Structure formats: C-alpha cells, structure tokens
C-alpha cells in the first residue's frame, strides 16, 4: 500500500491479518469517501490469501478507533441522490467486510462512533479496552441524520431493537462495561493486551451471536414490535416537538428492516440518509458542530497562555462549588476554596462529593479515583494557600464594592502573575478592575448554572486586560470541558443581553392576559428546552431579574420590565423552584413532575389569564426581540463573529439547535422578512420592536450573515 494510505495491511507469522487505521496528518481517524478504494484493495488481498485465519482492525491513534465519518463529505453533496449514493457506498463496503469468509475482529480503543461503530458492527466480533476514553455510539441524530452505513439494521439485530432504538434516537454513548453487558462487544480488556486478545479471537471460529434477553425477543415479534414503535414514537414526538425529522425517519427505517428484511432496511436507510442530509435542520445542526469545533480551536488571543498549575476560588456557593468540581475533576488541577463561612466550604466539598459519588454508583468511576479527585479540593476561611495560585476565580455575590474588595485582597495575598477572573453575570469588568494594581490580569469568566452541565462560558476582557490573560483564561475554560466565547465588556455581555428582552416580553404578555402554560408551551414547541417563564423560575426570579435595571440603565427603555410586576412577585416571596414557589408551585424537592402553575400569580400581577394570542404571535414577540438584540451585539462588536453569536445562543440559553442559532435563523427567514415582521410588531406593540439599523440595511441589500455552506462566514 502507498505511504499515504489510511489503512495498512500487515500479515503476521501466525496468518492473522492486522489492518491498522491511521489517517495521515490527523489527530482523529475519520472515514472519508476516498478510503473506499484503499479498503477494497485490502479486501481483495485478503480474499486471495487462502492461508489467512482471521483479520483484526486496530487504530494507530493513541485515543480513538474511528471517531465517525468526515462530515464535510455530506456538505459536499448537492442533492439527496448524491448523499444517498454516499450511504450506499458505505453500506457496500461494510457488507464486503462482513462477507469475508474468515473471522473479522474490531480491536477498539478510544472513541468508536458513527461510521466507526458501523465498521465495528460489520466485523464478526468486537473487543474493546476498559479505558475511560473508550466510548461506543451512533451520534448521527445530533447532526439531523441517521447512521447511513448499515447501523440502523445491524445494531437492532445484535443488541435488540429496544436498546438499539435508545442508542440511535439519542446518540447515547456507551462505556466499555455497558457495551459488554448489552452484547455490543464480546470482551473488555486492558489496553496493553487489546491486540493480543483480538488476535486470539480471530483465530477461533466466528463468535456465535449471543441470545437476546427475553424482553428483546418479545419486542422483536410482530405484536411486541408494533407496541414498542407506537410507544417510542409517542415519547420521541413529545421530546422533539416534531422539530427533528431524523428521529421519525430512524423509527421508520429500523421498523422497515425488521418487518420487511435487511434488503428493504438498507434501501430505506440510504434513501432516508440522502433526504435528511438536505433538510434545513441537518444543515443547521452541522453548522453548529463545525462552529463549536472551530471555537474550541480558537486560542482567544495571539499571546501564548501562561502555565496553569493551581487555581483558587472565592465563594463556596452553588457557582463556586460547581467551578471547583469542573476544575479539580475535569482539569485535574489542585483547587483551594476560600469562604468566610466554614459551611460554605463544606457545601462546595459536598457538591463535588455528590457528583463523584453519583458516578461511582453508576459504575463510571472507581471509589479510589473519586477519593483521588476529591483530594485535589481544599478549603480555608482566610488566604492561606493562595500565595502561588496561577488563577483565582471570584464567585461571590453580585455587588461591585464586594468584588472590588476581592480584587484588592487577592492582589495582596497572591503572586505577581496571578490572574483574577470574576464570575459576574452583569457587572462591567472595567469597573471591577477600576482600583486594581494589576488591571491587565483582571478578566471576566462567566459560567452558567449548573456549571457541570452548561457547556458555554463567556470570557470578558476589559480594555486593559492583557492578551496573555485572555489566552490563559481560554485555556482553562477549554480544559474544564467548556466552549468559550470572548465577548466585549458591555452591560449584560452577550447571553444575558439577548435573553433579557425575550423573558421581559414573556412577562409583558402575562400582564396582557396570556397564560403561563400557554407561553411556555409555545416556546418549547418552537424548540427551546424550557419556556421563558419556567426558565425564570429555574434560574431564580430574584437572580434572573437583577440584571434588568443594569441593562435598562445602559440601553434604555427597550429593556424595561413591565412596571411593578417583578417587585410584586418578589415581595410575595416568590423566588422560583429554589423556594418552591414562583410562577409555578413545586412539590417536594427533587420531584420535578410536581410543578403546576400557581393561579394566584394572575391577580398578583393584575392579569386575568384569559389568553387570546395564537402560538405564532407569542413565539414571534419573544424571538424577534432576541434576534434584534443579537444583531446589535454583532454591530457593537460585543461578539467577535456571528459564529460566536450562534454558539453562545445555542450553548448558553438553548436557542433551538435545529435552527442553527440566531444568525442562521435570520438567514433562513431572510433579513428583509425579519425587518417586515419587526416593523409590524413595532406598529402593534411599540418601539422596542424597531429593527436595528444593521438589520434594515441587510434586508434592503438582500444580504446574509453566513454564506451558503455550513462552515463559511460572510
């Protein structure tokens, strides 16, 4: 084989053929269309060598088997027929591997996802390592697609239809032991003996198919299957609100294969893959994937980052505890928490204990590893142990004087190189750094709650922040598993600035007589994970509304909340879920299904709760304000690019991913159409709906924010 080949054949002395996968010049192995000829050439050699006893596929990469297919291949397809042909080519290749007359074994270490798992499924047996990096899954649904190289047909037959549907419909990734339990792999071994075990398995007869559990056998029959697909269909429709066509097609394709046989199943899979690749939903989801990959490569500034060996945290509350957890347990850095109250330190330590203990219970972590990670976190009520911290994150109350005091104390009690990062959600970083002796080392690092789940962080340099401080803070955020966007130091930054008018408008509609559940249901149907009213309850009404006066002072009356409504709610001791009552009433702690709208909320805010607006009217009033503010943020350079704006909205507030973010959504509607809608709303409801100048100009010129491809900016 030529040197640049991604697949290399080596026949051992014991007549086992080892095919090594190593895509040249790439950290990750991904499958590309041009590899088909390489694999076919190897298959031809395998068929011609009658001495061979077995075949093993193994990766030369240190931490991945095959991470999936190269998504750019799909973007290059101009029609559904071209994408369908791509799927059929993949199916044919997998069929040729499966048809080899000798045992074929996949030796899996690291990520085995998408097309990688489909290749492993085409093999006759699979062995994987017990390493935490080893995960197996079919995540195509997250890109608005389905597995197109036989995965929808092979997986249900291997592990059972019910389990397979859960994996394919959610994109869920399995760890090694879960995969073994379900029968997805035949053995789990240490990395050091992976190839040896795979070779031994290849020397035996083909592994016989493992009998499915009784439940799966029942569900495979016509009656059980009909019941299962009806049930799963309802559940999926409720979860996706009909916004993700891929889930419906997955159900259809899997059922076709089981009811009509694999030939019909493969045909349906290829056709569905081709059609889904052309949907706006898949194009938007792929654009988010490319944008987030791009952001993760962005260093934030041209300067090299400073070393990070240890971190300090001020404040042991919910945010401080969450930040300590991701820093110690994901980055592996020692963390020192300072809180004036020992209870605060205990709270933060318990937070990490609870997270890690949950992993131990689910068998994702060994108890010894839990103890090792917990040992990285320590606490103090003074500044002992802070002298040599490289970066200190402040997570105290939203009070400017208090934060300025924290800066002064940190500068007195830490090293000259220490960075001070404030987890403020609204206060200008320039004001926090106003009296600093080292203002170039002060920066904003805004996490979202809950810290361990929310993928976004906003990094906010003020005018005097150094390039190295930016680069170092971006480096830490990435190590914490976050997607960082660098935003300008203006009131509300980016995420809260576009979120505030959206929530304000929802409250305004309440005062006009709309019902809480109607507003929330409409925005969930639109594609948000929760509605705006429920979101305010979840964040905390007191916390969520603190930013309104800050934004109103900075940007004027378009940020005004309906008069006296917020104060009436807070004066009635309504904080949301955290104290059991907000717009909704909540049952016992931890029982999320118990929430219900509190009818007393309507008289409290002087409303009737007799709704008259249609769903599209409710949605456009909330969403158009968010879009308009997002465009202002680009115009004022609050965000560095529309890429960051789309990522910030999707990862920070759950803007519908299938719409691709605010800027992709504006492009899909057309700037001119957005302007027309906003002008109509401005006539009906007031000047807050006046479209910003940039939007009007783009509408007049027929311009868009993105080019037509998934990856290119205009």
From Swiss-Prot:
MF-aspect GO terms: 3-hydroxybutyryl-CoA epimerase activity; enoyl-CoA hydratase activity; long-chain-3-hydroxyacyl-CoA dehydrogenase activity; NAD+ binding
Q: Is the keyword Lipid metabolism assigned to this protein?
A: yes
Which EC number applies? 4.2.1.17, 5.1.2.3, 1.1.1.35
What are the protein's UniProt keywords? Cytoplasm, Fatty acid metabolism, Isomerase, Lipid degradation, Lipid metabolism, Lyase, Multifunctional enzyme, NAD, Oxidoreductase
What broad class describes the main subcellular location of this protein?
Answer: cytoplasm
InterPro entries with a match to the protein in the record? 3-OHacyl-CoA_DH_CS, 3-OHacyl-CoA_DH_NAD-bd, 3HC_DH_C, 6-PGluconate_DH-like_C_sf, ClpP/crotonase-like_dom_sf, Enoyl-CoA_hydra/iso, FA_oxidation_alpha_subunit, FadJ
Which reaction(s) does the protein catalyse, per the Swiss-Prot or TrEMBL entry? a (3S)-3-hydroxyacyl-CoA = a (2E)-enoyl-CoA + H2O; a 4-saturated-(3S)-3-hydroxyacyl-CoA = a (3E)-enoyl-CoA + H2O; a (3S)-3-hydroxyacyl-CoA + NAD(+) = a 3-oxoacyl-CoA + NADH + H(+); (3S)-3-hydroxybutanoyl-CoA = (3R)-3-hydroxybutanoyl-CoA
- What organism, scientifically named, is this protein from? Escherichia coli (strain 55989 / EAEC)
Give the transmembrane ranges: none
Quaternary structure note = Heterotetramer of two alpha chains (FadJ) and two beta chains (FadI).
Function, in words? Catalyzes the formation of a hydroxyacyl-CoA by addition of water on enoyl-CoA. Also exhibits 3-hydroxyacyl-CoA epimerase and 3-hydroxyacyl-CoA dehydrogenase activities.
Task: Report residue spans for region: 3-hydroxyacyl-CoA dehydrogenase.
Answer: 306-714
Q: Indicate yes or no for the key word Oxidoreductase.
A: yes
Subcellular location(s) of the protein: Cytoplasm
PANTHER family given in the database record: TRIFUNCTIONAL ENZYME SUBUNIT ALPHA, TRIFUNCTIONAL ENZYME SUBUNIT ALPHA, MITOCHONDRIAL
Name recorded for this polypeptide = Fatty acid oxidation complex subunit alpha
* Region of interest (Enoyl-CoA hydratase), ranges: 1-190
Similarity section: In the N-terminal section; belongs to the enoyl-CoA hydratase/isomerase family. In the central section; belongs to the 3-hydroxyacyl-CoA dehydrogenase family.
Q: Tell me where on the tree of life, at the top rank, the source sits.
A: Bacteria
GO cellular-component term (any):
cytoplasm
Name a single GO biological process: fatty acid beta-oxidation
